[in-house]
């Protein structure tokens, strides 16, 4: 399985009318991952590679630039256990937490999924990667796999087993004089590289308990000059002249990595078992056994690995301080910008700014004490707002919902335990609403839980006050508050979640844990509770006709149809105004989707986590098996993305939101955020500023041409300078796409072409020019 690195060449057309975010081709992907919690580092000459638990990047020492390395660049996975670079073969190995592997040779990425996909039971983790000439030694939870760089093949898999047949874990290996030394959970073993039956573990010799090396797990192994070093417990042993002797030991100092070059053996150590560590240090051991200790409790907080480059600079992976360099007593820190966490619960875009609520709840809707605060992505830069520097958030955790006021810069975040936060982006102010505004949960007096948020057409903020005696709260547009008890069934325990508001101002409220949907309408008299319309929707004709009461998400489309995501696919309320009539006219229906000649209920076998509506009224659906684009009426599956057919970083898509200006679709997954630039944007009221990208269209560009800033569903006509129409289409929301071909399917010739766009009733027109450049 091969993938090839590609370089995305951005074609920049000098025009002040283009916003930076529009200079992205249709169909391109961009990951948004955290880069600050480093766990592995590898020196590669001019480059240093650094891995976090969720991402990989390189740092260029010559120009101080970063390159983010992830699925859009051809890498196979996210979630990294470790990396290793071999200067002799110029090979980078990326070992993932799911046992997948990528080998990077120059500009080629070779995926090796066979450990991941194997039927091996038990631990398949890859704990260490070592090189010996053309051979890569992969130390795994079951033993060792050998891989040859030149042939791209594995000549042998060695299963390490004890007397009972249970697998032994290989922690690492080194090759000296054609002899493999493997550190395992049961001690040190050795075998000749050219042993014809190397896969037979009985051919391996046990070295623990002999020549001074004690019996027990060997956690690390390394060669420095002519000596072999092994770590047993807290002690580093050295093997010279046929004897193992204790070399270095201090109680409670745990060696976590060994590295060597021509000058030093480098030992990375942590003191104690706390997180962050009580202390960390790096030991430099020279050829005369002189030990230099580097300690800095500010910079070294949870040390993972240290390597040394040819210039004598130490490059350090630290969980709390990202990639560090150390030289002449000075530390420097390096990391590309990214979100502070990979976690996502809810997202929204307002005025081209992405807001993320990264809190957590479990399947039983219990809070998880997540203190990641909230995240903001504005003009290409991520910012985090949490307890560090924001004392107002000291008692706030688990932001799981977010709503934005489209009129201004106000954004509301709902905490599942810490109340409601009002954030003004422009003023950079925060205001917290808890006691006196929201009700606590009986039996949990300090917990003010917000399960969902939604603004109605008159800008009243509706709040799911989860578990409260009055589970619906309203912050009215004038700033006053109300609390409402809709009389939910006893077994619901007033547990309320996501809220959406339809065009009738009806509130559709998720009832978690298999309790259906609450619909509530104040009947245009918000202060008069006596005339309110209330109904709980569930199974049965006239009662909602839900095919399952396990409702995960809700969405209102542009035709005021209510799309409901459940544990068993999607159902739709086509006539939401009829839900109070107790007739089948207001019931939900499962749409039938055409799957290439046969029909079935839409995503009936999928757990649907989220639904988002784009500018063309199509639905982006996030499930536990990937992301789908569904047609406006739900009868066609237009796109399906998963980890096997796209750069999507995980099949578990928890939340989707869309930037209506750019067409960016943000997928929030259980492994982080990735964005996809697609064809539909929101239409504008007046199409006074039409953008075309790319423009000019250069000869080597073969992608689609985007025309955005249009009125919704505008008719678009493209003509040559003689006025002849060569292509005509309708905008998807506020954006039209053109493949650069005429009606006859051939590429448009070099020249200037006119774009004429007219809205649906003909009252608005817009004009733009496109320069096509070909090699003809």
Language-model features: locations:
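Glycine-centered coil/turn sites that cap beta-strands in beta-rich domains
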Residues: 684-717, 735-738
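Short coil-to-beta transitions that initiate beta-strands within beta-rich domains
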Residues: 22-44, 70-87, 113-132, 157-176, ...
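Short, glycine-anchored, charge-dense loop/turn motifs used at functional sites
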Residues: 715-726, 753
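Conserved beta-propeller blade signature
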Residues: 47-50, 91-94, 135-138, 179-182, ...
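Short, conserved, GDST-rich strand-edge loop motifs in beta-rich repeat architectures
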Residues: 270-277, 357-372, 418, 470, ...
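Blade-level signature of beta-propeller repeat domains, shared across WD40, Kelch, NHL, RCC1
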Residues: 571, 652-683
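Short, surface-exposed loop/turn motifs with a glycine/proline- and acidic-biased composition
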Residues: 71, 731-764
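Short loop/turn segments immediately following beta-strands, especially the blade-tip
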Residues: 108-109, 149-152, 193-199, 380-382, ...
């Amino acid at each position: 399985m091969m993938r090839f690195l590609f370089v995305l060449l951005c074609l920049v057309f000098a025009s002040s009318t283009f916003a930076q975010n529009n200079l992205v081709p249709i169909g391109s992907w961009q990951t948004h991952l955290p880069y600050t919690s480093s766990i592995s580092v590898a020196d590669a000459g001019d480059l240093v590679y650094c891995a976090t638990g969720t991402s990989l990047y390189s740092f260029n020492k010559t120009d101080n630039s970063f390159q983010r390395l992830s699925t859009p660049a051809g890498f196979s996975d996210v979630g990294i256990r470790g990396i290793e670079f071999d200067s002799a073969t110029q090979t980078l190995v990326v070992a993932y937490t799911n046992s997948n592997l990528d080998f990077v040779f120059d500009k080629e990425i070779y995926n090796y999924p066979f450990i991941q996909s194997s039927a091996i039971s038990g631990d398949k983790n890859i704990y260490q990667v070592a090189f010996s000439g053309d051979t890569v030694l992969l130390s795994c939870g079951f033993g060792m796999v050998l891989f040859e760089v030149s042939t791209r093949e594995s000549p042998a898999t060695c299963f390490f087993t004890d007397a009972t047949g249970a697998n032994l874990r290989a922690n690492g290996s080194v090759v000296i004089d054609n002899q493999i030394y493997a550190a395992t959970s049961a001690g040190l073993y050795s075998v000749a590289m050219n042993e014809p039956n190397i896969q037979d573990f009985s051919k391996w010799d046990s070295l623990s308990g002999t020549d001074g090396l004690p019996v027990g797990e060997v956690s690390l192994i390394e060669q420095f000059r002519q000596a072999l070093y092994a770590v047993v417990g807290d002690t580093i042993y050295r093997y010279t002249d046929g004897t193992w002797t204790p070399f270095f030991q201090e109680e409670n100092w745990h060696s976590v990595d060994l590295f060597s070059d021509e000058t030093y053996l480098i030992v990375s150590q942590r003191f104690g078992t706390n997180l962050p560590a009580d202390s960390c240090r790096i030991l430099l051991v020279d050829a005369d056994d002189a030990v230099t200790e580097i300690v800095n409790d500010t910079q070294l907080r949870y040390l993972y690995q240290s390597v040394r480059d040819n210039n004598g600079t130490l490059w350090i992976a630290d969980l709390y301080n990202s990639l560090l360099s150390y030289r002449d007593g000075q530390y420097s820190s390096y990391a590309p910008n990214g979100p502070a966490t990979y976690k996502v619960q809810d997202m929204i875009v307002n005025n081209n700014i992405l807001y993320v609520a990264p809190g957590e709840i479990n399947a039983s809707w219990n809070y998880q004490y997540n203190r990641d605060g909230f995240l903001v992505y504005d003009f290409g830069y991520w910012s985090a707002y949490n307890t560090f520097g924001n004392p107002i958030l000291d008692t706030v955790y688990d932001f799981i919902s977010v709503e934005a006021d489209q009129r201004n810069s106000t954004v509301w975040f709902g905490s599942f335990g810490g109340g409601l936060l009002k954030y003004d982006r422009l003023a950079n102010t925060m205001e917290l609403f808890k006691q006196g505004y929201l009700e606590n949960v009986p039996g949990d007096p300090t917990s003010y839980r917000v399960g969902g948020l939604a603004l109605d057409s008159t800008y009243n903020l509706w709040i799911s006050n989860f578990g409260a005696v009055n589970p619906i709260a309203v912050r009215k547009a004038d700033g006053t508050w109300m609390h409402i008890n809709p009389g939910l069934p006893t077994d619901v325990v007033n547990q309320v979640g996501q809220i959406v508001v339809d065009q009738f101002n009806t509130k559709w409220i998720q009832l978690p844990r298999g309790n259906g949907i609450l619909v509530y309408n104040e009947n245009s008299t918000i202060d008069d509770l006596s005339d309110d319309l209330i109904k709980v929707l569930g199974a049965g004709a006239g009662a909602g006709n839900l095919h399952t009461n396990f409702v995960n998400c809700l969405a209102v489309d542009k035709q005021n149809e209510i799309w409901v995501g459940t544990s068993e696919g999607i159902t739709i309320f086509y006539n939401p105004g009829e839900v109070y009539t107790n007739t089948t006219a207001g019931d939900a229906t499962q749409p039938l989707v055409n799957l290439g000649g046969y029909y079935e209920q839409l995503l009936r076998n999928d757990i649907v986590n989220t639904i988002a509506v784009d500018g063309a009224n199509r639905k982006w659906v996030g499930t536990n098996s990937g992301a789908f684009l569904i047609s406006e009426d739900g009868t066609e599956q237009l796109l399906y993305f998963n980890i096997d057919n796209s750069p999507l970083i995980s099949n578990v898509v928890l939340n989707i939101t869309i930037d209506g200006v750019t067409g960016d679709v943000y997928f929030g997954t259980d492994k982080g955020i990735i964005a996809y630039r697609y064809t539909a944007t929101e239409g504008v009221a007046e199409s006074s500023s039409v953008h075309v990208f790319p423009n000019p269209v250069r000869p080597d560009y073969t992608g689609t041409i985007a025309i955005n800033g249009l009125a919704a569903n505008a008719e678009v006509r493209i003509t040559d300078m003689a006025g002849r129409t060569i292509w005509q289409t309708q905008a998807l929301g506020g954006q039209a796409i053109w493949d650069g071909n005429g009606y006859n399917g051939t590429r448009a010739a070099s020249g200037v072409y006119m774009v004429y766009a007219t809205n649906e009733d003909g009252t608005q027109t817009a004009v733009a020019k496109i320069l096509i450049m070909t090699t003809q």
